[in-house]
Each structure stands twice: as C-alpha cells, then as structure tokens.
Amino acid sequence: MNKSSLFKFFSCSIIGLAVLSGCSKNTKKSAKSDDPRLKEVVVYTYDSFISEWGPGLEIKDKFETATGYSLTWVDCGDGVQVLSRAVLEKDNVQADVILGLDNNISAKADAAGILESYKPADADKLIPSDVVAQLGDKWTLTPFDYSHFAMIYDTQSDVPCPASLEDLTKPVYEKKIILMDPRTSTPGLGFVAWTVAIYGDKVLDYWKALKPNILTMAPGWSSGYGLFKKGEAPLVISYTTSPASHVEYDNTDRYIAPVFEQGHTMQVEGAGLLKGAPNKEGAKAFLNFLISDEAQSVIPLTQWMNPANKNVELPECYKVAAPVPSKTLSADPEVTDKAVEEIMNLLAN
C-alpha cells in the first residue's frame, strides 16, 4: 500500500470512528431524553397541601400546562415527617423537590446535606428580603408562603379570649387547648419556638403550668384543626391568616386570631431541590414556577397563608380577618429542639 493509499485508509478510518462515536453519543442522548422519569417531577410534601381543598391540585394543573412536565405529589404526613423521609432516602433519592420545610427545621435539612442550592429566576424581584432571611441566604430553600403563629379562638365558647401566652395557663382554660406534636408537626414545633422566644430558659416552667390545659396534642395540623372545627376545644394553634378561610367559605367571623402584645413567631415555608434528584432540570422548572404570579395567586384562598411573591394581591377576607402582628419574635432552632425533648418528657409524666 502506497503512502497515498495509507493516508486515505487512516483518514477514512478516523472519520468513520468519529461518525460512529457521534452516533453513539446521540443515541445515548436520545435514550436519556426518552426516559419518562425526566418528564416527571416528583415532589414530597405534607398532607394538607395536597388535600382536596389545598393548593396542590391547582398548582399541578397550572405547572403541567405551563411547562409540559408531569407533576407527582407524594404525601409524607406533616412537615417534620417530610424532612424525615428525605433524610432516610438520602443515599437513594427518589424525589426531586421537597416542599413544606420551614424556618424552624431548615437548619436540620442543611445539616443533613440533603439539599442543593438553587435560586429561582427573578427571586430577588419577587420575594421580600425579610421573608428570604428567615430561611437563610444559601437558597437551599425557596420561600413560597408565610404567616405568624397564633391561637385561634372560638368566640361562641364559654371561655374568655386570651390576651397572651401567659393567659393560656389560667385554670379557666383547663382541657380547652389543642396543640400539635412538635416532633411531627411544623405548627407544633412553631408553638414551642414561640414559647421559647418569650420565656427563654424559663420555658419548661411555662409548660408545667400549661400542661393541665392541653386537651390533646394532635400528630399534625389537619387532624388538630379538624378537632377544633368539630368543637372539641375553643382554642387551637394555627396562624393569624386562618380566620380568613372561615370568612371566605363559611361566611362567619366566629373564629379569630387574637394578637398578643408580647409578639408572635413567624413561619416561612420553603421548597428545595434535593441533592441527587433524578430530574434536576424539572425540579428547577418547578421552583421557578412555584414563585411565579400564576402559582402564587393560588396560595391565599387554598393554603391560607401569605404568598411569598409580593406582587400577588391579597383577597378582601385577609384584610378583615387576618391581623398582622406588630412584633415578630424568633427563637434559636437548637434551643427549640432541646426544649422539645424536655417538654415531651414533661408531658409524658
């Protein structure tokens, strides 16, 4: 074989290999893009968010129409249980997004290393900085709603309306208060944080005085608030925004959220991209959509929380039945966690 023929042989061989290599890559890319899992976004969340009256179903429809992805919600119980499941699956991640972690458990999520930082497009323009600050500046969680914790009071009950957390320890409220378990429920944990913020190292003394007045400690918000609506007790831990739902759908102002002069702790709920998510691009698309005007407009009349997107106008029922406390308190999550352990031991004995 002469040099010319030899050159042509090697040239053709190299070109052939390049073409085959290109075909191989394209085949792999095509196979990957045809993977049905990459067309689906799986989101872990809590029960009330995807209940028949929650925002989940409408957000799913809007997201699928806007993006072409399919959205699968997975009910994990209450907020703390959502985190627990994600941590258990850390080495075998099944979901793409976790939704419903709040400022009282966000540090635990960060410490567990289950979240990947992602800042949605236009987040700085849409979400107020003070709301963002509640979840930190790492953007492992994107705020989607917020409200202050409050005791919801039934004005048709035979007990007076409390004016402070201290009032709740009075004998007149014996077995009149419904709380939620702080080990499984974010409102339950939020109430503990509220007591820590006000009583500090005396918080256990407060709970000793409060103990006789607790009717039950429900596993989650849905079950606890359900008992309240059935008339089992005249007081339940919830949010300052909760009475607006009764004004809007029950046409009643029977239930109110008294504002305490001492102040209230705030809950900011967030959603985050799970590290190792099977569909990372789909997860990012979901987080981008979650803070959009279209998704956020669903929040007020289904989630009964303030939308994180400041451009979304609140309905009239919020203006008449969702008071805004003048003083926002905060508590160290580590101190709150320690208090939870001590409080649950106290209540068990």
Residue ranges and their predicted role:
Residues V93-I98, E116-A150, E166, K176-P182:
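A structural signal for short loop-to-beta-strand junctions that line the ligand-binding cleft
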Residues G79-L115, K125-G136, Y225-G226, P243-Y249:
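Pocket-flanking alpha-helical
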Residues E116-K125, T140-T142, E166-T169, E248, ...:
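Short beta-strand->loop
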Residues A150-S157, V196, Q267-G282, F289-L290, ...:
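A bilobed periplasmic-binding-protein/Venus flytrap-type ligand-binding module shared by bacterial periplasmic
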Residues A193-P258:
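Ligand-binding pocket segment of bilobal, Venus flytrap-like solute-binding proteins
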Residues K32-A107:
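Early extracytoplasmic/lumenal segment of secretory-pathway proteins
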Residues M1-V41, N349:
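Short, low-complexity disordered leader/linker segments with a strong preference
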Residues K175-T184, F289-E313:
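Periplasmic-binding protein-like
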